[in-house]
Amino acid sequence: MRDYRKLTDEEIRVLENNSCWAEDWNRVMVAEDFRPYNFHRVVFYGDIRLGVFEKTVEVAKDFTKHSGINDATLRNVTVGDNCLIEKVGNFINNYTIGDDCYISNISTMETTEGASFGEGHLISVLNEMGDGNVVLFHDLNSQLAAFMVKYFKDKQLKDSLTRLINEEIRFTQPERGTIGNGVKIINSKEITNTVVKEDCEINGAARLSDCTILSSKDDSVYIGTGVICENSIISNGCSITNSVKMQDCFVGEACQITNGFTAEASVFFANSYMANGEACAAFCGPFSASHHKSSLLIGGEFSFYNAGSNTNFSNHAYKMGPMHYGTLERGTKTASGAYVLMPAKIGSFSVCFGKLMNHPDMRCLPFAYLLAYGETMYIVPGRNITTVGLYRDIKKWPKRDKRAASSRKSIINFDWLSPFTVGEIVEGKKILENLRLAGGNNVSSYNFQEYIINASSLKKGIKYYDIALRIYMGAVLKRAVKEGFLGKPTSDTGLGKWIDLSGLLLPVSEEERLIEDIKNGNVESIRDVLNRFYDINDHYREYQWAWTYQLMLDYYGLDELTDQAMQRIREDYVRARRAWIAEIRKDAQKEFAMGDVEQEVFDDFISKLDHEVDYED
């Protein structure tokens, strides 16, 4: 706690000569080395604490002003060292301001009674009419949010998690609004009940009310012109600009939301990009993207997702209200004009075309194209495995993680082939083989859940799924050899079904174990819950090996993994990988033949494919 002293009579005289006034000068306390010369037309009410004002502040590039306070009314305010506060149209009330801040041309900044700073709000994601399934707070990440959405119907679990989160909020919440060190707030109208962490810049915001902005020196936040943000939390590295309107939202690390995007009761995590469109009750996991004015994300759970223009979802059957929702698993895309009627579940890395009206559940056929032609629905299983788009996506996502090393709360596992997706592939391959067995080889098409699968598509689907299986098994075996955990797994953890918890790939058994520990009171804080997610991720390769080892035995009909078997797996891996690259090359050539792809772009892509042989060993 800093020591303050009262003003001397001489200091009061200097201040009054500079047109400053205080309701009670005895309640204006200053730092030991305080000098009163850089204060002009300042009015003080209540308890005031002032630091030293010795340095200059950069207000624009190559333009500095001396620190001080000019043309402002302050009530119950603490100001740190070397701040410049000027042109406050209304007042600053009940705030603590850090060091080296620049606050200029604002209207009002105040903390009112009962301020929550956006923390502890219960919002309803996916089910727009729900009772609430995500509690907003500063340490929320995509895993915890997905976990809450999935299990908040379990009252005991909900009560336990809510209690842990409320304890964390109670321990960390300030008594009044705070502005961190190095913050710049200019040309902004209203900032109410908002915590702003260090090195944040707010320029031209219209209203920030009941918010927490988690900026930091190495991963700062920018809030731009016309932004209205209420009851929300914004994480490190974010940019919220150009008249965004946001209410009851959480924005995770390094997200960009811009160009008039509107959002309500939604969460956005890690590197998501939202522009022009709208989100309501949407769960946008890592790398979710929507660029277009006519796109609406509503009642859906997404990750590694790209919304084409005029993408739309309907969560309303016009009967019991807007209560329906669905999941588009990781890597899914919706083409321009796509429409999905909820509830729906789309398998990982699939692409949706047209108006999908019959509530598909296609998690068992991943990497598919789902197409609607009028009333007729088609599915092309495995088609996306061999596309240029998939190849580019899986290469670009790791490079586009813009989060600073110090602010990576959400866990992102970039593996496109994992026990989660490969488990779906294994199931999908069996479904296609059984359809062929039941329908025979001499038919033109097959039916699956009201979707038509052309015979040629079924045959290719089996082929592509098998290619992916062999690539996956060979890649995991290669890593096991290099990292020294080859051999029979020492634990059964990892066997069985896997899930994707918004970026974290984990066995269902580990999720179930965490649920039981929370309900039984074996987890003492919400940070312990988060640490469990990190611990599961740290053991991913170990759990993956246990699952993949059993897959290899089952696929090749083995009792154990011998040297001869490993050689065969490796040879199959190389052949499958080359077949995969050859199919992607064909896809690229087909697009190039359309005539508007520049030769240089095509040649660069083909060169990357040519170098894929370098990764075989």
Q: Where are each of the predicted segments found?
A:
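Phosphate-/polyanion-interacting regions in eukaryotic proteins
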Residues: G68-N70, L74-D159, I186, T194, ...
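Intrinsically disordered, low-structural-confidence terminal and linker regions
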Residues: M1-D9
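Glycine-rich hexapeptide-repeat left-handed beta-helix
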Residues: D3, V14-D24, V30-F53, V57-I69, ...
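Long, compositionally biased intrinsically disordered regions
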Residues: Y373-D617
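A charged, amphipathic alpha-helical module
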Residues: N166-I179, I185
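Core alpha-helical transmembrane segments of integral membrane proteins
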Residues: I179, V183, N187-E190, V196-I202, ...
